[in-house]
């Protein structure tokens, strides 16, 4: 594996399939005294989910935080919106709704 591929998987978050808890390496795990910046692969073998006590095998990789959602091969489709992060998509959607609302309210000013 290349150095870039190894670096990308280090900061990946993992989600518990049982309860939905997300292990974020940037934060670590205070309940089990896991230091921040500890990758999921370096957690002890006996580490369990702090919420439901599921084993490490019950976790799935959901990728790093702040990246575009969806499959990487699908990010090139559409009008470029697929490359936006979920927060950027929220701003785009609700910003457009607010502008539309203001436009229709401004029609009351016409005589």
Curated annotation (Swiss-Prot):
Keyword annotations from UniProtKB, A to Z: Electron transport, Iron, Metal-binding, Transport
Lineage: superkingdom: Bacteria
Residues reported to bind Fe cation: 16, 19, 49, 52
SUPFAM superfamilies per the UniProt record, alphabetical: Rubredoxin-like
Domain Rubredoxin-like, residue spans: 11-62
Cofactor annotation remark: Binds 1 Fe(3+) ion per subunit.
UniProt entry tagged with the keyword Transcription: no
Presence of keyword Glycosyltransferase: no
GO biological process, one term: alkane catabolic process
CC cofactor: Fe(3+)
Annotated GO MF terms: electron transfer activity; iron ion binding
PANTHER family for this protein: RUBREDOXIN, RUBREDOXIN-1-RELATED
Function: Rubredoxin is a small nonheme, iron protein lacking acid-labile sulfide. Its single Fe, chelated to 4 Cys, functions as an electron acceptor and may also stabilize the conformation of the molecule. Could be involved in hydrogenase-linked redox processes.
Entry's family note: Belongs to the rubredoxin family.
Name of protein: Rubredoxin
Taxon lineage: Bacteria, Bacillati, Cyanobacteriota, Cyanophyceae, Nostocales
Gene: rub
